[in-house]
Amino acid sequence: DAVLARLGGSVTLGGVRIATVTALHSNGVDPDYLAADLAKHMKEGGIAGDAGPATGFVLRFSNGLVAYLSGDTGVSADHEVIRTLYQAKLAVMNIGDGFTTGPAEAAYVMNDQVRPASVIASHANEAGTVNGKVRPGSKTEAFQKAAKMPVHIPLSGRTMEFDAAGKCGCAE
C-alpha cells in the first residue's frame, strides 16, 4: 500500500512521523520510459517528462531520533529549516555530484546548515569503499574529511543503530 504525503505534508506510519521537505534538482523522466508513441514525439522534440518536485524526508522515530534524508539535492536555503524546525540529529546526505551536491557542497549543507550530530554518506555514484575501507581519493573520502561531524559509511552486512541524540552505537 502507498500513502501519499505531498511536499510540505507529513504522515505517520507505524509510529514514525514522515515529513516531506524540499530537495533541489531537476526531476525529468527520460522518454525511453514512456509509451512508444509519446516517447517518439518527446524524443523528436528533445524533451523529457516532468516527474514532479524533488523531495527529501524528515523521519521522527519512536525513540526520539530525528533523521533527515536529503534525497538528490543541491545546496538550498531550505536546508536551514531541517535544523531550525525539525532539529535533525542524523542526516543521510547524497553526495553524487553532477546532478546533486558534490562532497564540498554536501559538507557545507551538513556543517553550516543542517548541523546534525552524525551523517551517513550516501549515493556517491562511485565505489566509495573497498574491503570495508573508504577508497583514497574518492568523493566519499573528500566528504568525510570536510564534514565536521562523524561520517558513517554504509557497508554491506553492517547494521548501524542511532540513539535519539544521533549518536551511533556502531562498531567502526
Specify the residue positions occupied by each region the protein language model found.
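Catalytic metal-binding/acid-base residues of hydrolase active sites
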Residues: L24, G74, G96-G98, N125
